[in-house]
Every structure is written in structure tokens, then in C-alpha cells.
């Protein structure tokens, strides 16, 4: 293999924030955050969906509320529309 062109492959702790589940997987993702896990320090990445929380794997339906783009825009800039009227 050519030296210097491949990303670092290392163990990373992923945190599924939906069900508060942590797991260690090898990954090339980069992050500045770290976490102490089983006596070792690992890079730390949060995720919203994994096999622990996805309805296909759990067999349970779960409503994941994500604010829509229009609602987000209205929340951020709606005050300006009210002031101009």
C-alpha cells in the first residue's frame, strides 16, 4: 500500500443518543471529542440512529420528531415577519 494516503483506522466509541447506548467499532471518522471507555481513551462520536434504536432491528415503531425546514425557518425568522406588518 502507498504510505500517507490512507485515513487512520482506529477504534471509536459511538453513542446512540436515542436509546443512550454506547458501542466500540473500528472507523476512519475524525473527531476532536474523546471519552474514557473501559479504562481506555477513545475518540467519541454521537449518532441518532443505530441498530439499537432503528425500528427495523428493534421491531418497535418509534416516532422521531425532526423539525421541518419551514418550521425551522419560521422559528428563526418569524419575528421579522411580525414586525414588518
UniProtKB/Swiss-Prot annotation:
Tagged with keyword Ribosomal protein: yes
SUPFAM superfamilies reported in the protein's UniProt record: L28p-like (SSF143800)
Annotated GO biological process: translation
Highest taxon listed in the record's lineage: Bacteria
GO cellular component, one term: ribonucleoprotein complex
InterPro entries tied to this protein: Ribosomal_bL28/bL31-like_sf (IPR034704), Ribosomal_bL31 (IPR002150), Ribosomal_bL31_B (IPR027493), Ribosomal_bL31_sf (IPR042105)
Induction, per UniProt: May be induced under zinc-limiting conditions; in that case may be repressed by the zinc uptake regulation protein zur.
Gene Ontology MF terms in the entry: structural constituent of ribosome
Keyword line: Ribonucleoprotein, Ribosomal protein
Pfam families recorded: Ribosomal_L31 (PF01197)
HAMAP family: Ribosomal_bL31_2
Assembly with partners or alone: Part of the 50S ribosomal subunit.
Family under the similarity heading: Belongs to the bacterial ribosomal protein bL31 family. Type B subfamily.
PANTHER family reported in the protein's UniProt record: 50S RIBOSOMAL PROTEIN L31, CHLOROPLASTIC (PTHR33280), LARGE RIBOSOMAL SUBUNIT PROTEIN BL31C (PTHR33280:SF1)
Name this protein carries in UniProt: Large ribosomal subunit protein bL31B
Name of the gene encoding the protein in the UniProt record: rpmE2
Amino acid at each position: 500500500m502507498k504510505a500517507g494516503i490512507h485515513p487512520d483506522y482506529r477504534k471509536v466509541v459511538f453513542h446512540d443518543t436515542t436509546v443512550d447506548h454506547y458501542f466500540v467499532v473500528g472507523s476512519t471518522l475524525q473527531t476532536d471529542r474523546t471519552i474514557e471507555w473501559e479504562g481506555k481513551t477513545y475518540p467519541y462520536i454521537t449518532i441518532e440512529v443505530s441498530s439499537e434504536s432503528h425500528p427495523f432491528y428493534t421491531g418497535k415503531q418509534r416516532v422521531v420528531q425532526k423539525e421541518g425546514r419551514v418550521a425551522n425557518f419560521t422559528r428563526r425568522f418569524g419575528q421579522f415577519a411580525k414586525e414588518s406588518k
